[in-house]
Amino acid sequence: MTVFLGIYRAVYAYEPQTPEELAIQEDDLLYLLQKSDIDDWWTVKKRVIGSDSEEPVGLVPSTYIEEAPVLKKVRAIYDYEQVQNADEELTFHENDVFDVFDDKDADWLLVKSTVSNEFGFIPGNYVEPENGSTSKQEQAPAAAEAPAATPAAAPASAAVLPTNFLPPPQHNDRARMMQSKEDQAPDEDEEGPPPAMPARPTATTETTDATAAAVRSRTRLSYSDNDNDDEEDDYYYNSNSNNVGNHEYNTEYHSWNVTEIEGRKKKKAKLSIGNNKINFIPQKGTPHEWSIDKLVSYDNEKKHMFLEFVDPYRSLELHTGNTTTCEEIMNIIGEYKGASRDPGLREVEMASKSKKRGIVQYDFMAESQDELTIKSGDKVYILDDKKSKDWWMCQLVDSGKSGLVPAQFIEPVRDKKHTESTASGIIKSIKKNFTKSPSRSRSRSRSKSNANASWKDDELQNDVVGSAAGKRSRKSSLSSHKKNSSATKDFPNPKKSRLWVDRSGTFKVDAEFIGCAKGKIHLHKANGVKIAVAADKLSNEDLAYVEKITGFSLEKFKANDGSSSRGTDSRDSERERRRRLKEQEEKERDRRLKERELYELKKARELLDEERSRLQEKELPPIKPPRPTSTTSVPNTTSVPPAESSNNNNSSNKYDWFEFFLNCGVDVSNCQRYTINFDREQLTEDMMPDINNSMLRTLGLREGDIVRVMKHLDKKFGRENIASIPTNATGNMFSQPDGSLNVATSPETSLPQQLLPQTTSPAQTAPSTSAETDDAWTVKPASKSESNLLSKKSEFTGSMQDLLDLQPLEPKKAAASTPEPNLKDLEPVKTGGTTVPAAPVSSAPVSSAPAPLDPFKTGGNNILPLSTGFVMMPMITGGDMLPMQRTGGFVVPQTTFGMQSQVTGGILPVQKTGNGLIPISNTGGAMMPQTTFGAAATVLPLQKTGGGLIPIATTGGAQFPQTSFNVQGQQQLPTGSILPVQKTANGLISANTGVSMPTVQRTGGTMIPQTSFGVSQQLTGGAMMTQPQNTGSAMMPQTSFNAVPQITGGAMMPQTSFNALPQVTGGAMMPLQRTGGALNTFNTGGAMIPQTSFSSQAQNTGGFRPQSQFGLTLQKTGGIAPLNQNQFTGGAMNTLSTGGVLQQQQPQTMNTFNTGGVMQELQMMTTFNTGGAMQQPQMMNTFNTDGIMQQPQMMNTFNTGGAMQQPQQQALQNQPTGFGFGNGPQQSRQANIFNATASNPFGF
């Protein structure tokens, strides 16, 4: 089977981009050798006609080629089974049909067998056209005239150019004789066996090797049946040309009448040789002439001769009529062919001259044009060694090139006698052979000798001559049939003799080349002895000579190193040597890199294995089949005896988690993995009750397996599968942590005994905190402060203090899963201490030092009974509890910022403050307003007043300042009814504190100034437009924002404005400026020390001031009372002092967090001190997690006499969010955002 997968034709021309690719032209014929399964690049070989032509192999894109068209069909007329090259030739039988793809070479057709579907070559004379219409005889002239597609180059040594000369005229007698002989046509029936196959190129190397340049030089085998040939021919043609006589080989023509055989047809023709030319003149057709160097192959078999020419290509099979004529033609062609070789003639010429010779010892590369490139072992003639001692002019014996060579690179040869004798012997042999007739009898068999024997053992080699007679052997193009004669010794033809050198350069012999077979070179020495030398023993130069003569490739016998090669082109040889050396270095470098990579990978793998084993030894216990168990146990947190602890450890090690998972219904494939995870985490059997979903998920269990395990555990321990809300979920203002709507519901109690004060120790009320989870952002109930009850009442006395001493209701404990806050961390400022209560008006006995109550959770809706005769006291929700006392006709100002109005009759809702409950006292008939922030109140329809709050004023007593934002006007409210909740520009809602108080004007007494924001107001000293007027006393300053207030008369107190400069036109004024908020300080009876700063340190003007651990400035309670001044973010703090010394100090910073909406936060602290020292710290934290929050804050403190000291806060605690901010009682009604309107934004 051949190696050809198909015959293709190039559709487009392609230029190679890499050395592995093949250059093709359009319509080139290609043999497909290999198809690629990865890409579209196929390996092909280009068809080239000619014996010396190389058929290149390479890659071409499959889209550039297509299957070659079929030219015709032929049928086999003989069987062909003995193939010469099984890789390219097909075996077939008679009557097999073939598709012909190429018939340019008439001797070998490129076909496809229709029987076996194989591609390859078949002999052209073994087939005929299938239809029989076209004969080979008619196709022969066309085939003869068709030139080769790529003619093979002539031997490099051939220098004779062909010239077109007509054949010489013939004598009349010769012409008549030839004409008479031509009439005698040979009998076709006498040719029994099939015709011999023509000589064609053969490739000795593998066709699949892409790097090897296969030279197709297929030569027919020469067969001989026995030593004695049959001398009886069909006809005997005796020509006068047989007796050539003495003549010059290049001056006289030799002519023979021959018969050309094409298939089964025979045509008469004439063959002439002379003047270095060969003429073939057919009887019918065009004559052809070739120079002797165009003859690439010639061979004979009995009476048949095979000639192959190039330029133009033609393969001839001639029938000479008898074997003698055939041998004569072969001898003459051999002489002409040998004489035409320039290297042979040059060797004879050089040998005839007496020149100084030398042998090259080292390689030398020419660097200039006048230098000569030589290699070690080359033989040179020393032309001039006198001109320079260092550089000699030398000439290569082989190529004839001359140039300068370093003298130390050449070793001269001193034996001149041997050279002269050799030259004289060659000349004598040439003269002797020229006198002999060209037709000589030669032995047909080839001599065989021992390849390892020395060339000098001629007698030993001559004894074995003729021992292989009778065997069929393949002959080269220069081999001829000879008859062995033991009586006489033949001598070689001096024209064909040359000097042969072995590979080591030790032995040299002058001999004629006979042939090459089975890896041996047959030579005929000058002394007549025939020897056979192994091809691998000869030098590369001699092997190249044999390749040129025979057309066979002997690459496998050549030496690998380029040191001994003596090619005609030394530069190409040196380049090839360097290329091979570079490739070898690259291969070696790649090999080292691969070895290094393998070593590094091996080392890394070893380190990884060591680390893995170390981790396994560290984490896992020794493996006990079938499953690993843990040798260490979880540290026992309970105090058990050592023996019991060891027993527990042993039992935990023995627990079979694999069986546990099987009982849970887990798949067997996952049980082992879960078991390993449990053992690695050192889980024991006593930990089963603590296993939960998150733990199982962390240990790598699947969701379905988690459900199975938890069901098994619940069933095992008798637990109910109750879904609990995650403890770390957080809600917002309107929704619960589970996503449901936030409904303010609280359990109602009907037992008044639960409102009584209860004696509880701080240790009993403080729950244990858990540090396992960080629940800083979790919604928690209000903190419980540790109350220090100074007096314990067991029965009612009938005073207001009894109500204030009541203990709030404690709601039921939540589930155990709900974390309890740490009361120590949430401890607010204590409200007990030096607080001096006011004297009650009623005659009921009142406690002289009422103790503040502990705060309670905002979730309760606890109420206290309140008689209608009492006046409500204000509840401060943002600061500390201050007992308030009526000193005169003052009405304590009220600040309404979305507050809850209180009903004076009926029950008074107990309100939750930031730090405790404010004890209420009444010293007069005036009503103390209550201030609440964001608390739920009775239904108050919202009323839009144009962006401001309606101030509340009283008709008697001094009017305390009203605080409003962006007030544009005042609207009187109806009396005796609830105050409508009003929509302001900042979203602040005013509340009615018990009675409707319309805005009136104060005609006597002192009027507390009014503070407004965003309104420009002017005081002219007389009547005030849209403002309360003071006609009998000094007027307090007015503070506005974004306006420049002007005071034109009277005693003016300092005014503070934003983005404006205060102007003072009369009186003494102490300006106080504040950036980011207004701080107004009024002092009517003493000196005032204002201090305005942000994040500044407080000043202590009297006594010491220790620093607390939470960054608060502690104040001394004696002497001048320092007043901590808060830092506001968009509000104002007004401090009014009517007597005594008031010192304001910087309070702690207020932190505001707004994460999901718009927050407007206004803070205002108004302090009135009429006679004494007051110290008031304030700290406010606001958290808004979702939605819109408007949080105004205002703290009003009234101190009419005596010393009042409020303790410092110790910690900044988180307060619950939601409506009311945890500072007021929650209502039982529910907010519905879908019912929201402009006047009812929360949809109550």
Swiss-Prot record:
The protein's role, per its UniProt record: Component of the PAN1 actin cytoskeleton-regulatory complex required for the internalization of endosomes during actin-coupled endocytosis. The complex links the site of endocytosis to the cell membrane-associated actin cytoskeleton. Mediates uptake of external molecules and vacuolar degradation of plasma membrane proteins. Plays a role in the proper organization of the cell membrane-associated actin cytoskeleton and promotes its destabilization.
Name of this protein: Actin cytoskeleton-regulatory complex protein SLA1
Biased composition (Acidic residues): 226-235
Source species of the chain: Saccharomyces cerevisiae (strain ATCC 204508 / S288c) (Baker's yeast)
Homology family: Belongs to the SLA1 family.
Any Gene Ontology CC annotation: actin cytoskeleton-regulatory complex
Bias (Basic and acidic residues) ranges: 171-184, 568-592, 610-621
Intrachain S-S bonds: none
Higher taxonomy: Eukaryota, Fungi, Dikarya, Ascomycota, Saccharomycotina
Ranges occupied by Sequence repeats: 868-874, 877-883, 887-893, 923-929, 945-951, 1003-1009, 1020-1026, 1031-1037, 1048-1054, 1065-1071, 1084-1090, 1129-1135, 1155-1161, 1170-1176, 1185-1191, 1200-1206
PTM field: Phosphorylated by PRK1.
Topological category with respect to the lipid bilayer: Peripheral membrane protein
Modification type Phosphothreonine: residues: 831, 858, 887, 904, 984, 993, 1075
Localization, UniProt: Nucleus; Cell membrane; Endosome membrane; Cytoplasm, Cytoskeleton, Actin patch
